[in-house]
UniProtKB/Swiss-Prot annotation:
Keyword Plastid: yes
Transmembrane region(s): 22-42, 66-86
Cystine crosslinks: none
Entry keyword set: Chloroplast, Membrane, Photosynthesis, Plastid, Thylakoid, Transmembrane, Transmembrane helix
Species annotation: Tupiella akineta
Role according to the record: Seems to be required for the assembly of the photosystem I complex.
Domain of life: Eukaryota
Name of the protein: Photosystem I assembly protein Ycf4
Gene Ontology annotations for the cellular component aspect, listed alphabetically: chloroplast thylakoid membrane; photosystem I
Cell compartments where the protein resides: Plastid, Chloroplast thylakoid membrane
Amino acid sequence: MKPDSIRRYNVIGSRRISNYWWAIIIGSGGLGFLFTGLSSYLQFNLLPIIHAEKIIFFPQGLVMSFYGILGIFFSLYLGLTILFSVGEGFNEFNKELGIIRIFRWGFPGKNRRIDLSYSIDDVKAIRVELKDGINPKRTIYLCIKGQRQIPLTRVGQPLTLEEIEMQAAELAQFLQKDLLLN
């Protein structure tokens, strides 16, 4: 096997620093709201920095408890996506075997392993989608016969314009397919 006949790109998935950050922030905020709501119900300060006896339980304390529970659930969900490495995987392009393999981890269950394989001959082109603005979108797609387009880049933190162009051009040249800009 020649070292130039295989290209493999790892995809980070949910184990990004920003997901850890948001899980901690949302979880601690949720706990703060829940303790404040419970303190207003019990008329006893569970947190020494908050004077909950000044908060009426119905409706303020009840609403704060609800938001606290909701925040804790969101934090747990984010924590589980990090724990199970949801979205993590790789894109492998093997010219020697003539296959493209796209692998991702999902949530536990019957379909935890997402493993797609395609023939290189089924690939029509590599397409790059660029959208600027408040929420920029920079994605490389694998265009397969039958009008199917499979995203190859990670979700969340977009690559720089230079990185996306280099990766798409390198991939199109490696597969000897057309490069489309959209």
